[in-house]
Amino acid sequence: MKTITLRPGQMTLADLRHIYQHPVHITLDESAYVPIQQSVDCVQAILAEQRTAYGINTGFGLLASTRIATEDLENLQRSIVLSHAAGVGEANDDAIVRLIMVLKINSLARGFSGIRLEVIQALITLVNAGVYPHIPLKGSVGASGDLAPLAHMSLLLLGEGKARYQGEWLPAHTALAQAGLQPLTLAAKEGLALLNGTQVSAAYALRGLFEAEDLYAAASVFGCLTVDAALGSRSPFDARIHAVRGQRGQIDAASTYRHLLGERSEISESHKNCDKVQDPYSLRCQPQVMGACLGQIRQAAEVLAIESNAVSDNPLVFAEQGDVLSGGNFHAEPVAMAADNLALALAEVGSLSECRISLMMDKHMSQLPPFLVENGGVNSGFMIAQVTAAALTSENKGLAFPASVDSIPTSANQEDHVSMAPRAGKRLWEMAENVRNILAIEWLAACQGLDLRKGLRTSAILEPARQLLRQHVTYYDKDRFFAPDIEVASQLIAQRHMNELMPAKLLPSL
C-alpha cells in the first residue's frame, strides 16, 4: 500500500488518481499543524470575547441571524450533522468515498476552517483503516457545498450511521472500533467545517476526468486501428497541417496518431500507391476532433486540480488577522462547468468512434465485406453491434446537456442559485460506460477488419492492442452470440491497457 504525505494545497492529479484507484496510507505533513491550531485559537478567541460570528455561534442558512448560547454550541454542531444527513439513493462505492475523505482532509488541513487536528486525524485514521462511511449518491445541489453527503460522512465521527469495512456494513460504533477510534464531540465551527465544501462534487468530477482520460487513450488507439483496417491515409496526420492552424490539442493529437501509426507498416505499404484522394472525416479529421476533446479534458483537469487543493468552507477563519469572513467558496460552479466540458468531450469521443464503426460496415467506404463478415446474408456480422453503438451515442448526446445551466433555489431563497455540480459529475460515469462500450465495438470491428486484410500487420505500437483482443476474442468466421464479446472488450478497456501505448505527459493525470 502506497503512503501519500499530504502537504495541504499540493496534491497532484496523479496522487488523486492513485487515491481513487487504490487503498492508501495517508500521513499529514507537520507543516500543517501550526496553521490548524492557529485557526482553532482564533475561533476560541471569538467565543471568549463573545463576538458574533456566523457558523461559530449562530444558526445556519436563513437562520444565520439567530445567536446561539455558549452552552448550546456543542449541541449545535451535532445537530447540523444529524439534520443535514438527508441524502438518498445507493451508497457511493469505497473508491469515491476514499477520494471524498482525502479531499476533505486536504481542505481542512489548510488551516482556514477552525477545526481541531484531532478531528482531521480521525478522518485520516478512517482512511488508513479502510473504514468508509455510508454516503448516498444523491442529495446535493453543489451549493452551499455538498451538505447532505458530507453530513453522512461526518455521522461516523459522531458514532452515528454506518460504514463499510472490508465489504461489510457495520454500525458506526463497531466501524469506529475497527479503526481504534471513539465517537467525537465536535466543538464550535467543526460541524459546519466538515459539511461545507465541494469535495463530493470534485470527487464525482475527478472520477469522470480519469475515465475520460482512459477513454481518450483507447479511442486514439482504436481510431488508428480503424485507419489501417479501412486502408486510410497517414497524410492527414502530417505535422505541417496542424502547425499552421496552431491549436495545441490538435497538434498533440496528430503527434499521437503519428506515434501510434508509425512511419509505415505492412498495411500502409500495401496501399500507398492507391488512387484514393481523401478519407472520410471520421478518419481524416481525428486530430481536429480529438484535439478539441483533449483541450476540454485538459481545461477541466486544470480546474479540478485547483479545486482539489482549495478551501471551500464557509465561513473562513483568517487567524493572522483574527477575522472570520463569510463568502461563497462552497459554490461549485467551476466544478460543474468543468464536468460539463468533460461531458462534451466524452460525447464527441463516442460519436467519432461510432462514425468509424459505421464506415467499416459500408463496403464502398471500407473496401471490406459488408458488416465485416464473409458469406453475408447467412451471416449478419457486425450489423446490430453498430446499431448498439448508435443507440449509446444518442444516449450520450442527451446526457451531455449542461448541468450547470440548471438551478433551483433552496433554503427559503437564501441559497437562491446553485451549481448542480454533483449531477454534472455523476452523469459522466454513465456517459463513460456508454463510450467504453462504443469503443469496445470499434475495437472488435477494427480487429475483424484487419484480419480480413489477410494477415497484413499494422504498426509495431498498435499490434499489441490487436493481439490483446485476440487473446480473449476470436475472429468472426460466422455469426455467434455477440454481447459477451462486447463485454470482454469493454472490461479490457476498463483495465487501462491502452494508456501504456500513449506518449508520456499527453494526459494530465497520467
UniProtKB/Swiss-Prot annotation:
UniProt-listed InterPro entries: Aromatic_Lyase, Fumarase/histidase_N, HutH, L-Aspartase-like, Phe/His_NH3-lyase_AS
Gene3D superfamilies tied to this protein: Fumarase/aspartase (Central domain) (1.20.200.10), Fumarase/aspartase (N-terminal domain) (1.10.275.10)
Keyword Cytoplasm: yes
Keywords: Cytoplasm, Histidine metabolism, Lyase
EC number: 4.3.1.3
Gene Ontology molecular function, alphabetical: histidine ammonia-lyase activity
UniProt pathway: Amino-acid degradation; L-histidine degradation into L-glutamate; N-formimidoyl-L-glutamate from L-histidine: step 1/3
UniProt GO cellular component terms: cytoplasm
Segments passing through the bilayer: none
Recorded family membership: Belongs to the PAL/histidase family.
Alphabetized HAMAP family for the sequence: His_ammonia_lyase
Protein name: Histidine ammonia-lyase
Underlying gene: hutH
